[in-house]
Structures are given as structure tokens and as C-alpha cells.
Regions:
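Short, charged, intrinsically disordered terminal tails
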Residues: 144-154
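C-terminal edge-of-domain segments
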Residues: 131-144
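Compact, glycine-rich, soluble single-domain proteins
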Residues: 18-70, 83-111, 115-116, 121
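Active-site pocket-lining segment
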Residues: 71-80
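N-terminal intrinsically disordered, cationic/polar leader segments
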Residues: 5-14, 18, 33
Length: 154
């Protein structure tokens, strides 16, 4: 499972001209699901992402988490995070989970976020969405459970 997490001042997602999710200060999480992902990866990634302390304290040090700043979460499904650009000029997306598994684990990730105390605003799996955000910093992190859960700490 892969996530691109951005610290934002605000973010929203629009489908067919209607804003379906909107947040103030917090995290915009673009979420991609791989074919071997399970509910275990969902929970791990939700805990890791929502626990990050990447907001600045009074000394300008990244030391505060969502809870300390009253932050919100917007999650948008993004199968293109599994795009393979090794050959040619058009990406292949065969490394992404199929729609059934992708949607199930996307919904599970949303539920895990809510269970951790951060009920997310969100887009709709498989929809054509317009995402707007005002980045804060910018601070953007790439989280990949294949690396986070399986590699020894350096």
C-alpha cells in the first residue's frame, strides 16, 4: 500500500462539480492499493500516517501531530501510485490492485482512520475527481508499506 501524504492548509475533492470532501489544516492522503495488500497494511499505514508529527511547534520544529493542532484528514484513492514507467512513454497500471480489492481496502483504510479518532473526508473510489489543496511548507512524504513493514531500520 502506498500513500503520498501532504501537509495542507486546506484541501478539497470535487466529483461532477460537487464538493464531496473538504478539510482545513491537516493531511491530504493520496492512497494506492497493491495486489498483495491486506487489512494488516491498512491498519499499519493508518497508524503510521496519522501519528506523524510534521506540524511546527512554537520553535519552528516539526514536533506536533494532528491531535495537537486539531487537524483533519482528506483521503483520495489513487491507483496511479502503482504506475510503472519502466517501458515506453505510457505508464502501465497492472501493478495496482484490481477494483474489487482496491475498493475494499480503501474503505477499510477510511474505517481505520475513523477508528483512530480521525474520521476522514474522502473522495469516491474509481471516480473522476478534482483535488485542490494549499500545501503547507510544502511538506510531502511517501509512505510504502512494502518498505516500512519489511526493511530493517537504518
Amino acid at each position: 500500500m502506498r500513500a503520498v501524504l501532504t501537509r495542507v492548509k486546506s484541501a478539497s475533492v470535487t466529483i461532477d462539480g460537487e464538493v464531496v470532501g473538504k478539510i482545513g489544516k491537516g493531511f491530504l492522503i493520496l492512497l494506492g492499493v497493491g495486489p498483495n495488500d491486506t487489512e494488516k497494511e491498512c491498519r499499519y499505514l493508518a497508524e503510521k500516517a496519522l501519528g506523524l508529527r510534521i506540524f511546527e511547534d512554537e520553535n519552528g520544529k516539526m514536533n506536533l501531530g494532528l491531535d495537537a493542532i486539531g487537524g483533519e484528514v482528506l483521503v483520495v484513492s489513487q491507483f496511479t501510485l502503482y504506475g510503472n514507467c519502466r517501458k515506453g512513454r505510457r505508464p502501465s497500471f497492472t501493478d495496482a490492485a484490481g477494483p474489487e480489492l482496491g475498493n475494499a481496502l480503501y474503505e477499510k483504510f477510511l474505517a481505520d482512520c475513523a477508528a483512530l479518532g480521525y474520521p476522514p473526508q474522502h473522495g469516491r473510489f474509481g471516480a473522476d475527481m478534482k483535488v485542490e489543496s494549499i500545501n503547507d511548507g510544502p511538506v510531502t512524504l511517501i509512505l510504502d508499506t512494502d518498505q516500512l513493514m519489511n526493511e530493517p531500520r537504518r
